């Protein structure tokens, strides 16, 4: 067993007892902790997704198991991002696009992990800053209207060079890993998850000529709006953006690290999870 993965922190998003998955998650938590012990791993539970509260636990772990869906994985990845440690997802719930394995395949995955038969994928992440507040995004940063009515003007700059003004409901700045999330729903392009780029996809733009734009990750971007707006991180947290206040976005110096099976193939995942390339009439 490699020393680098001896201690596993287990993330579980807190779930209300009325949630249909509550009972399944409660049972799975105990089973996972027992399995980790049986396979020779030290483990502990992190079930608050509160970075300040769990900082010492995060420092203790060598890797993190995320029990749940993609939302749980995204929250854990952001919380652990600055610690430069890998996560892997065990799917319970819906899509599970980022997950490494189903619950019934976890034992085999852990055995492969002990034998170093697991691959480490490193993905581009975004680092954003508003004033003195910095944050990371795994899938996307969205600039959105605060008001239900009207059009939001967003001026976009690459460094100090203005390159576009978006007029609409908002703008998605996505990572390649996040290109299959909100970006895809907004008719943005699928970009291979290991690419080094940003995807800028306008939301309900007022102009017929506006189209999604893919930029190299070497650019430092900044944006400002003509009125107060919201900045949404991975669909899970929000920040206020004041009128004419700059939002700076650049490639994070630390990558998003996911442990995956050696057999995982990106294009196969697209077909299985999103029915990519399938006929609309074909049933799953």
Curated annotation (Swiss-Prot):
Binding site for NAD(+): 70-71, 139-140, 167, 169, 177, 180-185, 236
Active site: 70 (proton acceptor)
The protein's required cofactors: a divalent metal cation
EC number: 2.7.1.23
A GO BP entry: NADP biosynthetic process
A cellular component term, taken from the record's GO annotations: cytoplasm
UniProt entry keywords in alphabetical sequence: ATP-binding, Cytoplasm, Kinase, NAD, NADP, Nucleotide-binding, Transferase
Cellular localization per UniProt: Cytoplasm
Domain of life: Bacteria
SUPFAM superfamilies: NAD kinase/diacylglycerol kinase-like
Database matches in Gene3D superfamilies: Probable inorganic polyphosphate/atp-NAD kinase, domain 1, Probable inorganic polyphosphate/atp-NAD kinase, domain 2
Catalysed conversion reaction: NAD(+) + ATP = ADP + NADP(+) + H(+)
Major localisation: cytoplasm
GO molecular function: ATP binding; metal ion binding; NAD binding; NAD+ kinase activity
PANTHER family noted in UniProt: NAD KINASE
Family: Belongs to the NAD kinase family.
Function recorded in the entry: Involved in the regulation of the intracellular balance of NAD and NADP, and is a key enzyme in the biosynthesis of NADP. Catalyzes specifically the phosphorylation on 2'-hydroxyl of the adenosine moiety of NAD to yield NADP.
Protein name: NAD kinase
Organism: Helicobacter pylori (strain P12)
